[in-house]
């Protein structure tokens, strides 16, 4: 049985940990509201961009000289996987889910005979994958902001990806990130960003922009090819930006939930330790009283 001194020390230690987890929960909660609003506000823009590019792609299908960002390189032998994780832990299964999804995707592609390269945005992704895939990891970026995500960050990362694509270092690029649903729910998402994947609604001829009436006829100025040449690189940056916003909101939600659970568990542990401490102290006092009474009777 632990001594009273040991129990007091453990109670003090758990209380100290509880203060830390409670503070981290409040910090994550304050960041979550803004991160959630930003991620949700970006969704309509990115979705509209996808539909517009899908319509442009459909109207230029079969034309010669299509951009490789749209039509691809003509092969899919080399795949670049961009994994979005956090720089820090203490956020439940947030990082682990991305690491597992990336690991699964790498194995699937390698089983098909593809060459896989990994670019990790966030320290935890690189740390979790480098042991199993040291040769596949070609870079890691761990300097993204822990307070807010700016478009300049996404633009910098997208330029790196585009430079690699133009240099012929890969054929297909897939983004793996957590899409935010709620503070307790995040969905691991795989999104192909190079070459551009036409949305299923556009590919099926069902543009959701208009639910009734005649199908819209678009006229473009300048030409479709010029618009695509300008928008396709921007779309890569926008999709990376959306992934980063969704990932950041998911991280804050996961951390708030994890720290809330940790705070509750610490409270339960303090109650149990306090009960054990009081029982031990009571038993010790009772034992001392018995010894005193026994000594008095002997006299």
From Swiss-Prot:
Stored CDD domains: F1-ATPase_gamma (cd12151)
Intracellular or extracellular location(s): Cell inner membrane
Record-level Gene Ontology MF annotations: ATP binding; proton-transporting ATP synthase activity, rotational mechanism
Any Pfam family the entry gives: ATP-synt
Sequence similarity: Belongs to the ATPase gamma chain family.
Protein function: Produces ATP from ADP in the presence of a proton gradient across the membrane. The gamma chain is believed to be important in regulating ATPase activity and the flow of protons through the CF(0) complex.
Record-given protein name: ATP synthase gamma chain
